[in-house]
């Protein structure tokens, strides 16, 4: 159904006293323009990562995604306070430039002289509670596209959540022809284009763009776990990975007439998320969640079950509730093994080829782990030395998150969709 509830959730603080962002980082995020709602800003913070390192402050793809969610989580607590006073208090050195939330600017002297807003962690707000958003459905949609992506990242302490749905009825109309237009394009390129389309105008529930986005997501995830490939396609389509297990995987939309999988009738869906911290360095997983956010901005997806999220994320209207869909987690490295096992069983990959892919995946995981743990240590040292200017460059994680998790069960659940 079409979305009727426009709630969003802000970040947790990861053990800090305040939102983990400081003046230097906020200035860096807004250097291209003062409006966080600009399409270019949005596409920047979901698509960085074509190279693994970008800058000292934004070291990887997941950094800007997390940092922008911190910036919005802090600054939006200004207008969402009781009585909706938008310009009488600052977050860091920033205030909104107008009640319409057009942009963020340095606060005037009289506001700078007053204490900054002490934002709260894990807050849930409703866009319709702020009059200027409630009155302008088009602007609310544009804002909510981004706030949906923020929510999908912050419902749990792990990586961003994606929605995967398989339903033969989605292929009706001109979707198949539109999908052919993307033949030979990468998943990242397709996702980027669809995000632009969503920002330009709201998608109708189960309209052409909404259905095509869900098909693209299902093709990606079924390919990601090795269920579909050149010998077992989904209506001739699948995503081919150039170097599975590499630090920067590229997934290309491909076609094959060899064999098409038999798809059971009916509508089946699930939610999936990476639980290992190396999602921060995988732009495909980030873009998958962002496409899910585009869907959420116009459509009400199934609820995520309360038991799949921490207490602070339960019973959020339109997002989580009792008897909802289970949220399936996986370790990025372990999913490479699941992928290889399926391709080998289907005769697409030899044991020797699997050994090569898994050796590369081991090297990639160690490289990413070394980088992420180094940045985390540096951030901890910085925060101890600067208690009044704390920040995290990547979403906080624990060593336990590098474990295998429920990867096998998640892989089987995705495979069961067809």
UniProtKB/Swiss-Prot annotation:
User: What do the Gene Ontology cellular component annotations say?
Assistant: viral inner capsid
Compartment list: Virion
The record's annotation in InterPro entries points to: Sigma_1_2_reovir (IPR004317)
Q: Which UniProt keywords apply?
A: Capsid protein, Inner capsid protein, Virion
Superkingdom of the organism of origin: Viruses
Tell me what effect the entry lists for residue 383 to D. Answer: In strain: Mutant ts447; temperature-sensitive
- Tell me the outcome of changing residue 323 to V: In strain: Mutant ts447; temperature-sensitive
Q: How does it assemble?
A: Interacts with protein mu-NS; in viral inclusions.
What family name appears in the similarity comment? Belongs to the orthoreovirus sigma-1 protein family.
Further details from the record: Mutant ts447 is temperature-sensitive.
User: What function does the entry list?
Assistant: Inner capsid (core) component.
Q: This protein is called what?
A: Inner capsid protein sigma-2
To which species is this protein native? Reovirus type 3 (strain Dearing) (T3D)
Which gene is transcribed and translated to give this protein? S2
